[in-house]
Design a protein with these regions (language model features):
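Hydrophobic, Gly/Ser/Ala-rich alpha-helical and linker tracts in large acyl-processing enzymes
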Residues: 185-198, 205-208, 214
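Secondary-structure transition/hinge residues
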Residues: 73, 116, 165, 169, ...
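Short-chain dehydrogenase/reductase
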Residues: 98, 147-155, 191-199, 203, ...
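Short, flexible active-site loop motifs that bind/organize anionic cofactors or intermediates
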Residues: 7, 31, 55, 80, ...
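A general boundary/transition motif marking the beginning of the first structured unit of a protein
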Residues: 113, 192-197, 295, 314
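N-terminal Rossmann-like NAD(P)+-binding domain of SDR-like oxidoreductases, especially those catalyzing
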Residues: 1-184
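Short, basic/glycine-rich phosphate-binding loops at helix/coil junctions
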Residues: 183-185, 222-223
Length: 341
């Protein structure tokens, strides 16, 4: 049987493909290269030493999704990464975000049921918790109160999947709530390659370290945290990818609906990350303190005990390795995958 990885050429998707192939799974990758490129998948093949099926397709096109399932009748599980993902852009383009992100999953669900595929793992996010009343965050914390349309698309999609799961006793759903994925494959062959100005902290720091950007902008140093900067639960992307392999095994037990945080359970501040990256690259990272960004919260990290208990999974990498692997990727690929073109 095979696993459909929608959005499999993206940052998390490509690393997950590597781990799936290493675990012996057959995969079908679908991507429209909206925020990714073919070179990422060429490098996945190089790392894994294995080939796989690929379809260039947009998940918002139901006919295209239907064709994938019709031509690959052995698909029995979907890992759904396909979505727009820039928080800031979602605020200025809410219609595009709601249309795209909801349609991708709705189309997949509709086609799945016609092809007797009963397992789906959804790429959700800690953003569904909004501004939590306390930390660490457990899976039974309230969902909602999101501060941007991107986060709200995750809440809505979780609700859709939950309703479908309740309506169909054969459907098994894993909602994986990621915290802050960073890092790159230890080989340095694949990593995060954002189009344009990076939206996330570590790719931005990496661009500063490699000389592509002047300095890091730290948004606020007056939060109620040890050094005044925002605290987040950063997780190595390879650990996150391994969590998806564990989730497949969980779905094989036919749990119905399964919800799980994927994080380390440790919070690191913005300045902690800057200092760790500085050590990794052997350079001082210049930064400037800017005003807080609207919608940012002071601290966010998870209680990962459910993942350990029910998936047999826990994060292996610490912040030092996350930064070292990011630097290894960035220093060898200063222009991302364009370096290879």
């Amino acid at each position: 049987m095979a696993i459909l990885v929608s959005g499999g050429a993206g940052y998390i998707g490509s690393h997950t493909c590597v781990e799936l192939l290493a675990a012996g799974y057959d995969i079908v990758v679908a991507d429209n290269y909206y925020n990714s490129c073919p070179e990422a998948l060429a490098r996945v093949k190089k790392i894994a030493g294995k080939d796989f099926r690929f379809v260039e397709a947009d998940m918002t096109d139901k006919d295209a999704v239907e064709k994938i399932f019709a031509e690959n009748e052995d698909i029995d599980c979907v890992i759904q990464f396909a979505a727009y993902k820039a928080v800031g852009e979602s605020v200025s383009k809410p219609i595009e975000y709601y249309s795209n992100n909801l349609a991708c999953t709705l189309n997949i669900l509709d086609v799945m049921r016609r092809h007797n595929c009963h397992n789906i793992i959804f790429s959700s996010s800690a953003t569904v918790y909004g501004d939590p009343a306390s930390v660490p965050i457990r899976e039974d914390f309230p969902v909602g109160g999101t501060t941007n349309p991107y986060g709200t698309t995750k809440v809505f999609t979780e609700r859709i999947l939950t309703d479908c799961c309740h309506a169909d006793p054969e459907l098994n759903v894993a909602l994986l709530r990621y915290f802050n994925p960073i890092g790159a494959h230890p080989s340095g062959l694949i990593g995060e390659a954002p189009n344009g100005l990076p939206n996330n902290l570590v790719p931005y720091i990496a661009k500063v370290a490699v000389g592509k950007l002047e300095k890091v902008h730290v948004f606020g140093n007056d939060y109620p945290t040890p050094d005044g900067t925002g605290v987040r639960d950063y997780i190595h992307v390879v650990d996150l990818a391994r969590g998806h392999v564990a989730a497949i095994k969980k779905l094989e037990q036919k749990p119905g609906l399964f919800i799980c945080n994927l994080g380390t359970g440790h919070g690191y501040s913005v300045l902690d990350v800057i200092n760790a990256f500085s050590k990794a690259c052997g350079k001082e990272i210049p930064y400037v303190i800017d005003p807080r960004r609207p919608g940012d919260i002071a601290e966010c990290w998870c209680d990962p005990s459910k993942a350990k208990r029910e998936l047999g999974w826990e994060a292996q990498y610490g912040i030092e390795e996350m930064c070292a692997h990011s630097w290894n990727w960035q220093s060898h690929n200063p222009d991302g995958y364009k370096t290879a073109e």
